[in-house]
């Protein structure tokens, strides 16, 4: 602001006409004494750093004469306002999670995110130019134990080179092991034994194994190794079976 001056020996009542005027980048107000104030408006935020604009306002006095007030506006490089994001997902509860990042820069109305995909330790993040993001757990998340919590942070970039982050918390669940059963058929005195292999897998327990040992049954003995290999050998009681008689031995491993 400042003060405009006006004097007229023939008109001691000379004064400015109080008024407010809107310019392209702000508003000028003048009172009767010539005091003026210029207030920046929203449009000034769009000026790039170092960009210079001039506003000229015509000011009227009460005798009809006019003068001008000139204001020079210089823009500054406004920092962009960028959000970060967090997300939480439970293994196997949902296939993915997502959200929206926001970015605003008065000096750069075309500011956008750089789209792409990033692989993390437990999943992948995909990002669109408009800030839409999706996180999808990968196979490594299956190895998390029940209740185990891990966090991974992705850094995403905008077209002006600035960055922000997406932080994901992944909680593991107790995956049920996948275990096969086994069956075998044996004819008395035709073969000495019958065998096969049981399988077991558990994403939460890669060291899962069978408890080795032997179990007597009604008509023979089952032997199981830690790797699931099993052998059934008929015992003396099998000799008591009549021709064509069929019996079943069941074992819990």
Regions found by a protein language model. Name each.
Residues 21-75, 92, 118-172, 189, ...:
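Acidic, turn/loop-rich segments in luminal/extracellular domains of secretory-pathway
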Residues 68-70, 79, 110, 165-167, ...:
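Residues at or immediately flanking beta-strands
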Residues 35, 79-85, 132, 176-181, ...:
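Glycine- and aspartate-rich repeat motifs characteristic of hemolysin/RTX-like Ca2+-binding segments
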Residues 1-22, 81-119, 178-216:
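Extracellular ectodomain surface segments
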